[in-house]
Amino acid sequence: MKSTLRPALVLFAVLTLICGVIYPYAITGIGKLAFSEQAEGSLVSRNGQIVGSSLIGQAFSSPQYFWGRPSATSPMPNNAAASSGSNQGPLNLALIDSVKGRIAALKAADPANTLPVPVDLVTASASGLDPEISLAAAKYQAARIALARKMQLEEVQSIIDRHSKAQYFGFFGEPRVNVLALNLALDQHH
């Protein structure tokens, strides 16, 4: 028994050291060297104060700000620890009701807006934490924000254009914009 127990314990100790200590520290070190901002959470700070992460959406509800995608992490919106999609199918009555409610809220916030409501403003993403919205979703909200901030519509659209990102590799996804970056730019501008 001693002859089989000793190699098993040695193997256990060696693998614990490699997999539990050496590998995690090595990968963390490489990540911090190669991708220092991302390894630290892609935190965004303003005046020395951390205001969010560029990788995790935040809940904005003031008419003076761009609103992101709905969060699927309830009861706390945009809770990274509870990241997941809603798992509701397109025929699920709960999904249909929540989409109708979100459309009604968007229409109530900007009754003069006659544009079609972009789908990403009424449906959660697969992770439930998307920090970005489509350009259509940003432009849909531009008039409401301009009115609330007493800005020219062209100024808001210019901020959207300056912060827009192209498709990944020129063909994956669609042009998009980070909601936190837009809102910080609005605060800085006005």
Curated annotation (Swiss-Prot):
One GO CC term, this protein: plasma membrane
Stored NCBIfam families: kdpC, PRK00315.1
Main location: membrane
GO molecular function term, any single one: P-type potassium transmembrane transporter activity
Function (record text): Part of the high-affinity ATP-driven potassium transport (or Kdp) system, which catalyzes the hydrolysis of ATP coupled with the electrogenic transport of potassium into the cytoplasm. This subunit acts as a catalytic chaperone that increases the ATP-binding affinity of the ATP-hydrolyzing subunit KdpB by the formation of a transient KdpB/KdpC/ATP ternary complex.
Similarity-based family: Belongs to the KdpC family.
A matching Pfam family: KdpC
Subcellular location: Cell inner membrane
Top-level taxon of the source organism: Bacteria
Quaternary state and interactors: The system is composed of three essential subunits: KdpA, KdpB and KdpC.
Protein name: Potassium-transporting ATPase KdpC subunit
Phylogenetic placement of the source organism: Bacteria, Pseudomonadati, Pseudomonadota, Betaproteobacteria, Burkholderiales
Keywords linked to the UniProt accession: ATP-binding, Cell inner membrane, Cell membrane, Ion transport, Membrane, Nucleotide-binding, Potassium, Potassium transport, Transmembrane, Transmembrane helix, Transport
Transmembrane segment boundaries: 10-30
Membrane topology qualifier: Single-pass membrane protein
Organism: Herminiimonas arsenicoxydans
Keyword Transmembrane carried by entry: yes
